[in-house]
Design a protein with these regions (language model features):
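Juxtamembrane intracellular "pre-TM" segments in multi-pass secondary transporters
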Residues: 1-7, 182-219
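Helix-loop boundary and gating motifs at the non-cytosolic
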Residues: 2-55, 212-251
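Hydrophobic core of transmembrane alpha-helices in multi-pass small-molecule transporters
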Residues: 18, 86, 99-119, 221, ...
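Helix-to-loop junctions at the C-terminal end of transmembrane segments
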Residues: 57-71, 157, 259-273, 357-358
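C-terminal ends and interior cores of transmembrane alpha-helices
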Residues: 81-97, 282-294
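Multi-pass alpha-helical transporter architecture, strongest
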Residues: 90-94, 172-186, 343, 371-402
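Cytoplasmic helix-loop-helix junction between adjacent transmembrane helices
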Residues: 108-141
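A membrane-interface helix-boundary motif in multi-pass transporters
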Residues: 155-172, 354-379
Length: 402
């Protein structure tokens, strides 16, 4: 396993995460508002569900490729370029008011290219660290990059414009160019004599046989169901309450994430993983409960808690897998996490939350307290499941601190 020994290597990993998150947020946070501004509100739920559908297909395939066939850095480069190209096509179709079904088809192609990126980049970074506990400070730069993308969109004044897609596409091209400065990891072992089951990465499903692995996968998946409503609908709620630069205000979510990420290294050294997960899940419940009060102050507090919940649950899950799964399965384990979270969780969430939002709309306006209150209830049920199911035991010495 390669180790991060030089400052130059550390800077490379930091830049990788920063640019990737900046590109992702510039598009993700503004997408819902762009669709609304161009008369495409009717397809919003399906547009976000495209990401979930893609997560069933491409992460495991490309994760297996990065484990066995092609150096992960090269996989990341070509996927970043494919993301930039398809994002430009989507933005052009929206700008010129093309048929909504063509726009949805292009969004699906974009999602297929984009879905594996976080898992692969995380596997690249983790493979170069001597200790997975070092991951949190580097992952912090992804949080700062996400904030930078939100602020960039608002500074450019393109919160509701298809131009936000062109800005994000440019950042993906920059990321692809930057990968040429990353030293490639060791070329994966030969793919000879592999079954199609293994070539498609489906053997990663065997990880679910382990009880604690299964609980972690299921917990993050279930939490993604209410979480999927955050970016499609929180900016709309902000604008309804009078916040004009919603994308910039959404960056408050990353303030608590910065604090949580900065604290995660210490927490991993002093707390059991179980208590870190529980703390993150509690923040998840409070995030929606405070939003349900539906005043400017409480909604902003709810938005702010999003980041702490995300870091303590989802980033800890990535570190958990790196500690508890053999290194030869690293990319596939992260890919399976992407499939479960962004696939199963988000697909149920985007479609279900689209229905739930419609059910909360009245002739007098959206019943935001009812909407967010329902999501707080779901998050509380996820917390109860984790408390009842997680044991924190496993097969190797690293499990003792879980």
């Amino acid at each position: 396993m390669l180790k991060t020994l030089r400052k130059a290597e550390y800077v490379e990993l930091v830049i990788l995460f920063f640019i990737q998150a900046m590109a992702a947020s510039a598009w993700t946070v503004s997408l819902g508002m762009v669709l609304d501004a161009h008369g495409l509100h009717a397809i919003k739920a399906l547009a976000f569900a495209a990401t979930a559908i893609a997560a069933f297909i491409s992460p495991l395939i490309f994760g297996a490729m990065a484990d066995r066939h092609v150096p992960p850095v090269r996989v990341l480069r070509w996927l970043a370029l494919a993301t930039a190209l398809t994002m430009s096509l989507v933005s052009t179709a929206i700008k010129f008011h093309c048929n909504q079904w063509l726009i949805l088809a292009l969004l699906q192609l974009l999602a297929l290219a984009n879905a594996p990126l976080t898992g692969i980049s995380s596997a690249i970074v983790l493979a170069r660290l001597a200790d997975s506990k070092e991951f949190a400070p580097i992952r912090l730069m992804m949080t700062l990059g996400w904030m930078a993308g939100c602020v960039l969109v608002s500074l450019l004044g393109v919160d509701t414009s298809a131009l936000s897609g062109y800005a994000a596409a440019t950042l993906w091209v920059i990321l692809a160019a930057f990968t040429f400065f990353l030293p490639p990891l060791e070329v994966p072992k030969s793919a000879e004599n592999l079954s199609w089951h293994e070539r498609l990465g489906l053997d990663a499903l065997t990880l679910l046989k382990n009880r604690d692995h299964r609980v972690i996968f299921f917990t993050t998946t279930l939490l993604n169901i209410p979480l999927s409503a955050f970016y499609p609908y929180a900016p709309t709620n902000l604008r309804n309450l009078g916040f004009t630069h919603a994308s910039a205000w959404m960056a408050l979510a990353q303030v608590s994430e910065v604090i949580a990420m900065a604290s995660l290294g210490w927490l991993l050294g002093n707390w059991r993983l179980k208590w870190i997960f529980i703390c993150g899940l509690i923040f998840g419940v409070l995030r929606f409960a405070f939003s349900a009060i539906n005043t400017k102050t409480w909604l902003l507090i709810g938005v702010g808690l999003h980041g702490a919940s995300y870091a303590l649950v989802f980033v800890t899950a990535q570190i958990y897998l790196d500690q508890r799964v053999e290194s030869s399965w690293r990319a596939r384990a992260q890919a399976l996490l992407t499939l479960m979270n962004n696939g199963v969780g988000y697909l149920i969430g985007y479609l279900g939350m689209g229905w739930w939002f419609a059910a909360c709309v009245r002739p007098t306006g959206t019943q935001w307290s009812l909407f967010w209150g329902g999501l707080a209830t779901i998050a509380a049920m996820v917390l109860i499941y984790f408390l009842a199911a997680y044991r924190g035991t496993g097969a190797n010495s690293q499990n003792q601190s879980a």
